[in-house]
């Protein structure tokens, strides 16, 4: 259930501006689109945190799974990591750093695997969720380090420039955002409906 919720909303975590990162003529605009994506990812995570704080109990009741309530609070962390990583990954692809992008995935699975084994051996609850978060943030930190080596942070953070770019590429959140959310919801909502109609053990 947790991963279904995260997967549904992660496609719009950064407003789909991450898809525009490869398009600008200048590297400066490309980097500022990454900054813009990070801002949107933060907003998405913050809004989801407020919703979970206010309605976490109602959400878990709706999903017919009271045990998930304690883990819902981690959803903002997952959404933020996905949104930010997608932006940095597109920038690395723009730089033709394909090996770096592939290495990040390997690093994610490695950290995630070690963490999963640890939680499995110690019989601690929520191992899959925590391991997924550890893997994602490990991948994100490595991607940021790789971007730093390629001069990413030489470009200053500018609200004015990001506002200009947000308007220039507004079709991405307006068009791709809604369609991506609809497609993602179509793929994952059946699992949520099964949980509502039956029980979490049925869903797995």
Segments and roles (model prediction):
Residues 2, 7-57, 70-73:
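Membrane-water interface segments that mark the loop-to-transmembrane alpha-helix transition
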Residues 3, 8-9, 50, 54, ...:
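Alpha-helical transmembrane segments of multi-pass membrane proteins
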Residues 20-29, 80-107, 117-118, 122:
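Membrane-interface junctions at transmembrane-helix termini in multi-pass inner-membrane proteins
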Residues 1, 60-62, 118-122, 184-204:
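Helix-terminus/linker motif at the lipid-water interface of multi-pass membrane proteins
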Residues 143-188:
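Interhelical loop/hinge segments that connect adjacent transmembrane helices in multipass membrane
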Residues 69-76, 102-152, 202-204:
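Hydrophobic alpha-helical transmembrane segments
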Residues 1-10, 69-70, 130, 164-172, ...:
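Interfacial/gating helices of multi-pass transporter permease domains
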Residues 1-25, 41, 79-87, 139-142, ...:
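Small-residue-rich midsections of specific transmembrane alpha-helices
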């Amino acid at each position: 259930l947790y991963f279904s919720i995260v997967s549904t909303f992660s496609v719009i975590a950064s407003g789909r501006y991450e898809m525009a990162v490869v398009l600008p003529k200048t590297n400066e605009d490309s980097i500022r689109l990454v900054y813009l994506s990070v801002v949107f990812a933060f907003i998405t995570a913050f809004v989801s945190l407020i919703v979970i704080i206010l309605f976490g109990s109602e959400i878990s009741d709706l999903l017919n799974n009271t045990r998930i309530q304690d883990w819902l609070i981690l959803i903002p962390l997952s959404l933020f990591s996905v949104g930010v990583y997608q932006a940095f990954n597109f920038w690395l692809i723009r730089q033709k750093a394909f090996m770096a992008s592939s290495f990040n995935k390997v690093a994610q699975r490695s950290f995630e695997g070690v963490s999963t084994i640890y939680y499995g051996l110690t019989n601690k609850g929520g191992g899959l969720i925590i391991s997924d978060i550890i893997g994602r943030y490990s991948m994100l930190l490595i991607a940021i380090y790789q971007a730093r080596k390629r001069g990413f942070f030489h470009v200053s953070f500018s609200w004015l420039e990001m506002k200009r770019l947000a308007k220039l590429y507004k079709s991405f959140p307006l068009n791709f955002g809604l369609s991506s959310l609809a497609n993602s919801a179509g793929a994952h909502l059946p699992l949520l409906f099964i949980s509502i109609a039956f029980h979490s053990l049925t869903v797995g």
